[in-house]
Design a protein with these regions (language model features):
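Polybasic, glycine- and aromatic-enriched phosphate-binding surface used to engage nucleic acids
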Residues: 1-106
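Non-catalytic DNA-recognition/assembly elements of restriction-modification systems
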Residues: 98-187
């Protein structure tokens, strides 16, 4: 019999995990690809999940160029075959994650929603731009003095991003994304 005898008992250990708010990621990747999930997706292939507090904020940080660079340079142990690298839990735990600051965290969380909705609707220009904003905000959050001295602050110019909510229709979500993109991309 190929099914382990303790399968039901082990299944109880994971009971409810996939229905929680979580970050889903693959272990071997070409680039960071952390997905914030609230819909209870069940991955069809090997994937890992992070749960806990501030998962949406953490999604933004983990997908940023800065933390991806730090992970690849100091924790990934070099590239695997084909330019891929491995996100191992033991090394992810060592990343220098800064505790969320209220204003920055809200902006990053709103941008995660904007990016994920834009990607689902194939809005590549908007999602790429919002990803660049996250990268800039993460640099600003980790290196505030250097960014301020260089006169490259983003947060003071960002304003309050209109949130995307579950009760919005798809058309309303896309309209919010387009308005925010238009407002920020070419002010």
């Amino acid at each position: 019999e190929w099914v382990p005898s303790n399968f039901t008992r082990l299944g109880g250990f994971f009971n409810g995990l996939l229905e929680k708010k979580k970050i889903v990621y693959a272990e071997i990747v070409f680039d960071s690809a952390f997905y914030y999930d609230v819909s209870g997706i069940y991955p069809e292939a090997t994937a890992f999940a992070l749960t806990g507090e501030h998962t949406k904020y953490l999604t933004a940080l983990l997908n940023s160029q800065l933390l991806t660079f730090i992970f690849r340079a100091f924790y990934a142990g070099g590239d695997l075959r084909g330019d891929t690298f491995r996100y191992k839990k033991v090394f992810l735990q060592n990343l220098p994650v800064v505790r969320p600051n209220g204003v920055v965290a809200l902006a990053l969380e709103a941008l995660v929603d904007h990016i994920q909705t834009a990607k689902l609707k194939d809005q590549k220009l908007q999602s790429t731009y919002f990803e660049q904003l996250i990268d800039g905000l993460v640099y600003e959050f980790y290196f505030p003095d250097e960014i301020k001295t260089a006169g490259k602050e983003i947060l003071p110019h960002l304003g309050e991003l209109k949130p995307i909510t579950d009760d919005m229709s798809e058309a309303e979500k896309l309209a919010v994304i387009q308005r925010e993109f238009d407002r920020l991309y070419d002010p």
